[in-house]
């Protein structure tokens, strides 16, 4: 497909290098967003059926860490025990829309409950159930999304227990990730990708590099070790806050970040 786009659409003819595949195709994803629904078969927390918004309850997903399954099952048990209503897209009623989980290389997990309301009942019982399922739970966050939209996350967040971030190491740097932070799903492949990009760039230490759509600054800070100066731009305010904090955390002084539309 890439070759076809380059040759047929772009009129560019070149030899493509071999694909650098992952060492393991299993358990590599560091983030998951489970939709929640209650239908004829009861409460379902899993994934959408192809080409639909029907939620299929899943026993496991081999692309996710085992901690994700443990947290999903504990969350489902909490909803059943306290009869917490799932959000219904057709009526706009109900409370729980999604369960969001982020994990890091150290085995920690950050859970976010996406709700159609500003309050979540029985939060003490929920945090206890999640911590029992995964002792390395770092935090539990409530995201409020009152809009009738396909966008999963709303704009308002509240920490219910623990902290609202994880730290992750990438290419020898440490990054703080909040719930809305963009971070590549496959850590190991991301490191290979960034290292290859740095080789292709052939930086000498004199360049000023622009990193558009920079997210939390992962590529920017990797480039900064070899470039003279790096400027990152991103439209998401929280991501820019994270990028600036990550630069300070890693002692990078030749990178600056601006919030704005890079397009």
Walk through the language-model features, giving the residues of each.
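SAM-dependent transferase fold signal centered on methyltransferase-like domains
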Residues: 1-158, 170, 195, 199-206
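Rossmann-like S-adenosyl-L-methionine
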Residues: 122-263
